Amino acid sequence: MRVILLLLTLDVLGVSSMMTDKNLKKKIEGNWRTVYLAASSVEKINEGSPLRTYFRRIECGKRCNRINLYFYIKKGAKCQQFKIVGRRSQDVYYAKYEGSTAFMLKTVNEKILLFDYFNRNRRNDVTRVAGVLAKGRQLTKDEMTEYMNFVEEMGIEDENVQRVMDTDTCPNKIRIR
């Protein structure tokens, strides 16, 4: 039932329209950097928290039914690389990371990608996260407005938005396995 509500909500918000695009692979595959994150529970994205992800790369198969996400998490001053595999069912990807995660992607333009996910941890706590990935280090004013509107549509408070790019000291390169 929750998945159906999630799909309906995201469809109404226009997020799912990107998922059926024929050029999906071209739009999302490549090197990306996390610029901002926002969460329903802001402590889940604070420095050192497992949902504070420093993205590096997204890869997907022919129709993007399977997607590989490469990112770092910082534990103290140390960066740990992760690769998670999302499998698509309808317009939502499902993956195992810090419990179970359901996520969606939305392109803004060739340089900006929005994402939204629900994470249910091992204690059954649910956190909603909305982020923006970019090819560069800054967003234009219009891109920032688009992201803040996205955060609001996802039901996350403005004060829970954090610029994570400034704390990203992890390596630029990743090991693709």
Curated annotation (Swiss-Prot):
Pfam family, one: Lipocalin
Cellular component annotations (GO), alphabetically ordered: extracellular space; nucleus
First and last residue of the signal peptide: 1-17
Protein transport found in the keyword field: no
Description of what induces expression: Androgen-regulated, increases in concentration with zinc uptake.
Main location: nucleus
Compartment annotation: Nucleus; Secreted
Segments traversing the membrane: none
Record GO terms (molecular function): odorant binding; small molecule binding
Cysteine-cysteine disulfides: 79-170
Expression sites (tissue/organ): Prostatic epithelial cells.
SUPFAM superfamilies to which the protein is assigned, alphabetical: Lipocalins
CDD domains cross-referenced by the UniProt entry: lipocalin_OBP-like
Origin superkingdom: Eukaryota
Keywords from the named record: Disulfide bond, Nucleus, Secreted, Signal
Family affiliation: Belongs to the calycin superfamily. Lipocalin family.
Identification of the protein by name: Probasin
